[in-house]
Amino acid sequence: MTSNAMFEGVFCPSITIMNADGTIDYDNWGKHLDHLIDAGIDGVLLFGSIGEFYAIDVKTKAEAVRFAVSKVAGRMKVLVGVGDTNLDNVKALAAESEAAGVDALLAVSPYYFGPSPDCAKRYFSAVAEATTLPVILYNFPARTGNDLTPELVAELAGENPNIVGIKDTVDTISHTRKVIAAVRKVNPSFSVLSGFDEYYTVNRISGGNGVLCGLTNVEPETFVSLHRAWQSGDYATAIKSAERISYLMRLYDTADLFISAIKGAVKAKGLPIDTSIHEPAVQLTDEQYRNIQSILGK
């Protein structure tokens, strides 16, 4: 069950592991990247939502991108989230990322001011024109306040050859299904990845290409097992892996912010990281961490 899509399988939006002073902990982050590779993850996204893109400056991101590309060394694909409300910052990080040798960029729709479809179209087209790299759209209306409709996605794909995919983080699989139906008319190889962890199977049934989701930080092996079982037609194993993922979804309910929950779970799995996230986001409490440990202990 393969396709000609450029991005297919299981992709991890990596946490950005930090020291207590807010600087990046490259030692533990490198170990985390190695773990993803050893598990068989198809690619990693730097500076997505879980990677706290909104709170880190372009210079720090560029340095981190160079580190990650060197660390990964071609063992999996490297994607970079270039999202920002300032288009100049988007273009600057896109240029730095392209120079570093990443495989693709991911651009979230402009947030805060709720752009019209025409504004969003101009924005994404400007991002695509600023790079020769493949660009993946990022639709997360719960956080951005605006939705990339199936029709808009199809228009962008048809008019910009290097817009080659979308991460559709919408808790309604019918939206993703409609995106697939619309965009495949203009680009049969367009990649459609779901942002919700438990949607891998229904995404694939609907004609999509997999997931780019947070729990891959915690148990990448489980997601890889699901993907490989699906590809080979081993549906008994696929169901078992999907059931585990369904159970792990309760981790998201343990903390005030999903980023804290994921960092806490990575720590509980054995990587001795600091679970700090950038203020003003709420930090993980001791009680929340104990709840995470309890969930993962079962």
Where are these regions (language model features)?
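Short helix-capping segments at alpha-helix termini
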Residues: 70-76, 100-101, 131-133, 158-162, ...
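Catalytic alpha/beta core domains of metabolic enzymes, predominantly
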Residues: 143-246, 252
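A general structural signal for well-ordered alpha-helical segments in protein cores
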Residues: 29, 61, 65, 90, ...
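C-terminal alpha-helical cap/extension of soluble enzyme domains
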Residues: 6, 11-16, 35, 39-41, ...
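Generic non-transmembrane alpha-helical segments
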Residues: 67, 71, 130, 182, ...
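A general structural signal for stabilizing positions within well-ordered secondary structure
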Residues: 1, 35, 96-97, 157, ...
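Active-site beta->alpha loop and helix N-cap motifs at the rims of alpha/beta catalytic domains
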Residues: 3-12, 17-147
